From Swiss-Prot:
This is Nuclear migration protein JNM1. One of its GO terms (molecular function) is structural constituent of cytoskeleton. InterPro entries: Dynamitin. GO terms for cellular component: actin cytoskeleton; cytoplasm; dynactin complex; dynein complex; microtubule. Component of the dynactin complex composed of at least ARP1, JNM1, NIP100 and ARP10. Dynactin comprises a short rod of ARP1 polymers attached to ARP10 at its pointed-end and probably associated with the capping protein at its barbed-end. The rod structure is implicated in dynein cargo binding. A sidearm formed by NIP100 projects from the ARP1 filament and is implicated in motor binding. Interacts with ARP1. Residues 114-139, 200-245, 331-367 form a coiled coil. Disulfide bonds: none annotated.
Amino acid sequence: MNVIDLSDPAINVDYDSLIGIDNEESQEIFENEVKEDGQQEEQEEASSRKDGLIVEPGRDVESLRRAIRDQLLFKIHRQNQSDCADARKLSNDEEDESRQQKLERIREELEELKIENLTSEMQTEIKELCEIQSKLATESSSRLTNLRKKLLETYEGQDTVILPNIILDTSNIKRLQKLDQKISLMERFVGIPEALEAEEDRKSVHSKVNELYRSIQLLQGDDKAEGKLQKFRDRLVELNEEFENSLLGKKIQQDLRLKDDTVSKLVMPENKVKEINSMYSMFKQYQDSLPLLAERMKSLNKMNNRVIEVYETTKGLDSQITSIQEQGKVWLKALNELDKKFDEQEVKIRENMEQIRRKIDTLEDEALQRNSK
């Protein structure tokens, strides 16, 4: 029995030229005389061996046609499988095929070959390949299990964990603690940061100290020259002298009532200075609570604005409700008028209906009289 070697690359079959083999027009019938001797078969075998083909003797056209059709269907099936495999590879981001996947793929291909109608020798070869594949699969699975066991044994064997050598220096921590205490003391004298953040201007402590220094300098005066308050006092004295020398001052000197009134209403510079000092001391007492009062006033102002907005909206709604009520009254009046007109129309229609009935009765009587005559 001759064997067809399917893995030989020298055999190139043109399947496109064999597509029309099922057509009745392309079929040709060849007649051949059967010889008793086997010379013809030997000549055919020799010619086929020269061409590189091994042909089975005694094979009819139907079996050849079936074999070609099966080969074509197998090729199409393999092409579809390769397309599906390519699509899977692309969907898996072109990952490399592992050894277990290769063995699985070989097993599937061998199962497909088992299904086909092949010769006994090819079936034996396929069985041998299946055995080799199963052996390789068992070897790979055993290797994986051994590796897992080794990894688990090495992992379970590690009972102790080596930590890095960390040296803690307590001197830096103590320094930080001292600095924190100093900062807390400074905050007590300077002010709380939360109160500073609550203010809108958020001025620094240095700028606030400069402002206080300027205000104190205005009140106490400068050591190098005359104080500013002294200059202010001298200017007030000059203005007082000018006022006395003016016409109004002369009138006041002449009229005692006018003088008493002006003196009672006049505020002396000493009183002004005392009032400024008292205000300064009062401001110094309430300087911590002034930002909170300012924030409270702002919140009350916002609340007042919201109340005004609500009042305006309610006022607008009230005006709209009144306009709707007026429109309702107008519509009610119009409906009453329509009701009256409908009643009048109904009365008129009834009167007209009675007149029509009377006319119909008279016409019926006249018709009966005419018929009787």
